[in-house]
């Protein structure tokens, strides 16, 4: 009975949402722009030939660009207008967020100056995006020229044509940012996040197909179809377990109770307002940092195919070697501690608590509060940082052990982004539904009050002919009667008879 009632309530909410014109338009705008982004992402630029063999294409691009293809929306794999994608904008956002702390006082002042300061920082971020986009587009062109398997080639490799590709890819970055802004303002959810999520979801079917074909050759058997089915079933089960584990970690928080000065201990700690600190407070940013640092020597070595440095990098710094994977894990753990501290900012929290007359029960305001929050954050990171590192290196470990291609969309990094984006989209839809319900309720109440007032005005409408002083509006006034001199021949009034 309870399940039936809950289903009916859910159905009623969905029907109410679909009847709301503004909400339906927002969803339609979001879906249309995401579809437009995906269509442009699969159309190669003119003058570029791409091999039909996806494995050769993946081998022709380094792991660094595989990650940035994931972050950029998936346009790099087809060398489309969105080949660079929105990953330069994400890099610029991360750098501006780091510099907006106490590292650069003017930026820190802007970050603390309200909405106007945030708009200026956003404008600066757009300018910082430009060099990142140009450098990444140039690196893509250089790697295509130096690739060994010919998965991608230019029909005309002249300097002017390559400069045209760099300008076009850079322009595609800003077009992607523009589409994301429209989704954020006119649609549902965060536009940039949804574009990244669309790229990950678009790559999932191809990733599953590739893994199904590859896993069939891992174990030699008389029945390859059965072997492929069993191996892929185990792989898909592991994928679901990893998905559930990441969802659990992303939604796990450490709650620090907060109390207002002057209020007695009326409620217990479990009922007090609290400060939530996520188990994975840094998100996927440490993975991006570590990948960027690891990619620098790899990318430089790609430009010098015959040098000894290239073989050293491939033997020790590549993410396909145990040494490279170990170094990658260490960098992720270090950046997780570093970025989570910047993200939470215990010093700023302690200062805000002091200004708003709030405190943590049992902890003195000020420096002790800062130390307490830092201590809690460090304890959380001892769990969250290794978990994030293990999740990030899963595709590389699978590739190293089973000798299968690296598919980051099916790996930990792609799942982390997918889970975070899906949870953010769910919160946005729920917020939109709540806002829609309140707007409809307010509109109904306003219409009801207006109708009641109109009815009361009609029922209690005064006789304007008796409004001698014009207090009820402009109308014909009735002049007050003046005393006339009585004529002795006039008849007496009734009142005068008494």
Curated annotation (Swiss-Prot):
One Pfam family matching this protein: SecY
Subcellular localization: Cell membrane
Regions annotated as coiled coil: none
Annotated signal sequence range: none
Keyword set, alphabetical order: Cell membrane, Membrane, Protein transport, Translocation, Transmembrane, Transmembrane helix, Transport
Segments for region (Disordered): 478-498
Record GO biological process: intracellular protein transmembrane transport; protein targeting; protein transport by the Sec complex
Compositional bias of kind Basic and acidic residues: 478-488
One term under GO cellular component: plasma membrane
Mode of membrane association: Multi-pass membrane protein
InterPro entries: SecY, SecY/SEC61-alpha, SecY_CS, SecY_dom_sf
Highest taxon in the source lineage: Bacteria
Membrane-traversing stretches: 23-43, 65-87, 124-144, 163-183, 191-211, 229-249, 281-301, 322-342, 382-402, 406-426
Quaternary structure (record): Component of the Sec protein translocase complex. Heterotrimer consisting of SecY, SecE and SecG subunits. The heterotrimers can form oligomers, although 1 heterotrimer is thought to be able to translocate proteins. Interacts with the ribosome. Interacts with SecDF, and other proteins may be involved. Interacts with SecA.
UniProt record similarity statement: Belongs to the SecY/SEC61-alpha family.
Reported function: The central subunit of the protein translocation channel SecYEG. Consists of two halves formed by TMs 1-5 and 6-10. These two domains form a lateral gate at the front which open onto the bilayer between TMs 2 and 7, and are clamped together by SecE at the back. The channel is closed by both a pore ring composed of hydrophobic SecY resides and a short helix (helix 2A) on the extracellular side of the membrane which forms a plug. The plug probably moves laterally to allow the channel to open. The ring and the pore may move independently.
PANTHER family found in the cross-reference section: SECY/SEC61-ALPHA FAMILY MEMBER
Name under which the protein is recorded: Protein translocase subunit SecY
């Amino acid at each position: 009975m309870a399940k039936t009632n809950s289903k009916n309530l859910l159905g009623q909410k969905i029907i109410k949402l679909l009847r709301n014109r503004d909400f339906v338009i927002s969803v339609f705008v979001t879906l249309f722009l995401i579809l437009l982004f995906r269509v442009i992402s699969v159309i190669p630029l003119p003058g570029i030939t791409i091999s039909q063999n996806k494995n050769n294409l993946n081998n022709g691009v380094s792991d660094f660009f595989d990650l940035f293809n994931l972050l950029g929306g998936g346009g790099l794999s087809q060398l489309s207008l969105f080949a660079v994608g929105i990953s330069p904008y994400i890099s610029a956002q991360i750098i501006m967020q780091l510099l907006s702390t106490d590292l650069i006082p003017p930026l820190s002042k802007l970050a603390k100056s309200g909405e106007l300061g945030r708009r200026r920082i956003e404008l600066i971020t757009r300018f910082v995006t430009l060099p990142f986009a140009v450098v990444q587009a140039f690196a893509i062109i250089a790697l295509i020229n130096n690739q060994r398997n010919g998965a991608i080639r230019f029909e005309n490799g002249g300097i002017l044509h390559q400069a045209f590709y760099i300008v076009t890819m850079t322009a595609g970055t800003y077009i992607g940012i523009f589409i994301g802004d429209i989704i954020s303002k006119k649609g549902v959810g965060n536009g940039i996040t949804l574009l990244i999520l669309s790229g990950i979801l678009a790559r999932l079917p191809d990733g599953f197909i590739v893994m199904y074909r590859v896993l069939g050759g891992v174990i030699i058997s008389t029945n390859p179809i059965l072997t492929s089915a069993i191996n892929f079933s185990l792989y898909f089960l592991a994928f679901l377990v990893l998905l559930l584990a990441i969802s659990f970690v992303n939604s796990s928080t450490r709650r620090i109770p907060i109390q207002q000065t002057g209020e007695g201990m009326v409620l217990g700690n479990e009922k007090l307002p609290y400060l939530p600190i996520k188990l994975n407070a840094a998100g996927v940013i440490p993975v991006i940092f570590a990948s960027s640092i690891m990619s620098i020597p790899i990318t430089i070595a790609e430009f010098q195919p015959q040098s000894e440095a290239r073989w050293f990098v491939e033997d020790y710094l590549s993410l396909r070697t145990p040494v490279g994977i170990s170094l990658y894990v260490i960098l992720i753990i270090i950046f997780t501690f570093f970025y989570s501290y910047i993200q939470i900012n215990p010093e700023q929290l302690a200062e805000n608590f002091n200004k708003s007359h709030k405190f943590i029960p049992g902890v003195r305001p000020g420096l002790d509060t800062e130390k307490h929050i830092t201590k809690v954050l460090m304890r959380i990171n001892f769990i969250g940082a290794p978990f994030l590192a293990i999740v990030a290196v899963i595709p590389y470990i699978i590739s190293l052990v089973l000798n299968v291609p690296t598919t980051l969309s099916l790996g930990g990094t792609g799942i982390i982004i997918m889970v975070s984006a899906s949870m953010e989209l769910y919160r946005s839809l729920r917020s939109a539904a709540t806002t829609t319900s309140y707007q409809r309720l307010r509109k109904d109440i306003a219409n009801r009050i207006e109708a009641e007032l109109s009815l009361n005005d009609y029922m209690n409408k005064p006789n304007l002919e008796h409004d001698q002083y014009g207090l009820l509006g402009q109308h014909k006034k009735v002049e007050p009667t003046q005393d006339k001199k009585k004529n002795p021949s006039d008849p007496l009034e009734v009142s005068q008879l008494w």
